[in-house]
């Protein structure tokens, strides 16, 4: 079909069959499960605890006091203990987007555009979730990992100090001296040059990659000092290149999966709130796909984490 004149080819917001990106492609193949793609891509979801989530959220009980016992002699009065508990309430928040295509694009589906867009949207949701969980980026959640006040540099290895010393000695000391644990590690891909030359006390590579892994996995998994570790491309924020700590302090949940709604009857604003540009889908033979998901996340104790940075002595970056 000949291209229309209402919307230019290669429109910034609407996919059409005449777009340059669709030229020369064969018939598409069946796409895969899209929410599994989101779970697979999110690295925080790999280590955090997943909890059931209702539409109004969840109230999570949490013990904050220890139950005690004492040795006693015959006939002695037995001690009394109570312990203490509190609760955390986590609520789901919605994330959404809409993508628009011409009806002709929907029918022809060049280069499996629709299937690819669904996967890309799922990935975008996962990236937004990780950014909120790690750094509080555009986050509706009140807590996130980066609220920790603990930090150690894995790039500042002057003198006899090694990456092993910084992570397994200095970083771990910050945790255990505060009564915390080290269960997992998240690192950005930009730390790979640092890790490649790093050894443990026995001269073995500090980062030991998993023997078996998916060839198409969006992240690399392995271990650092026996702790499960993930390297991915979206951990870095400023000078922070990773986190180590107790990931059992993180919980997340979802309501259902990704929700897809398709319509050709609505009116969309292709502009902004301040400068609207309303377009009738029906009048212009367009189709809109609305994608929504509801996630909840809570970091119970940010001080159970150490931010790993690339800051070197003198204020620079490694």
Curated annotation (Swiss-Prot):
Gene3D superfamilies: hypothetical protein PF0899 domain, Major capsid protein gp5. Its main location: virion. Keywords: Capsid protein, Virion. It is found in: Virion. The keyword Lipid biosynthesis does not apply. GO terms for cellular component: viral capsid. It comes from the Viruses. Pfam families: Phage_capsid. The keyword Cell division does not apply. Belongs to the L5likevirus major capsid protein gp17 family. This is Probable major capsid protein gp17.
């Amino acid at each position: 079909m000949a291209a229309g004149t209402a919307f230019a080819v290669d429109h910034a917001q609407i996919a059409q069959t005449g777009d340059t990106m669709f030229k020369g492609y064969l018939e598409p193949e069946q796409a895969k499960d899209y929410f599994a793609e989101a779970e697979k891509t999110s690295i925080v979801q790999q280590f955090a605890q997943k909890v059931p989530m209702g539409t109004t959220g969840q109230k999570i009980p949490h013990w904050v006091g220890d139950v005690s016992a004492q040795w006693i002699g015959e006939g002695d009065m037995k001690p009394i203990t109570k312990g203490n508990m509190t609760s955390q309430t986590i609520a789901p928040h919605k994330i959404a987007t809409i993508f628009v295509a011409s009806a002709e694009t929907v029918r022809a589906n060049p280069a499996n555009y629709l299937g690819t867009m669904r996967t890309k949207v799922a990935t975008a949701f996962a990236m937004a979730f990780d950014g909120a969980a790690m750094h509080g980026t555009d986050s509706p959640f009140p807590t996130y990992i980066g609220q920790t006040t603990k930090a150690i540099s894995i790039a500042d290895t002057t003198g006899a100090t090694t990456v092993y010393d910084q992570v397994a000695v200095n970083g771990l000391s910050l945790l255990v001296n505060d009564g915390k644990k080290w269960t997992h590690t998240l690192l950005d891909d930009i730390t790979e040059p640092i890790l490649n030359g790093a050894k443990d006390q026995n001269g073995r590579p500090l980062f030991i990659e998993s023997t078996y892994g998916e060839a198409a996995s969006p992240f690399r998994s392995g271990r650092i000092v026996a702790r499960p570790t993930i390297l991915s491309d979206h951990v870095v924020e400023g000078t922070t290149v990773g986190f180590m700590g107790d990931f059992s302090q993180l919980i997340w949940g979802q309501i259902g999966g990704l929700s897809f709604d398709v319509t050709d009857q609505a009116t969309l604003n292709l502009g902004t709130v301040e400068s609207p540009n309303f377009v009738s889908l029906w009048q212009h033979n367009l189709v809109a796909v609305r994608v929504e998901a509801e996630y909840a996340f809570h970091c119970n104790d940010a001080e159970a984490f150490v931010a790993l940075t690339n800051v070197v002595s003198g204020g620079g970056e490694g």
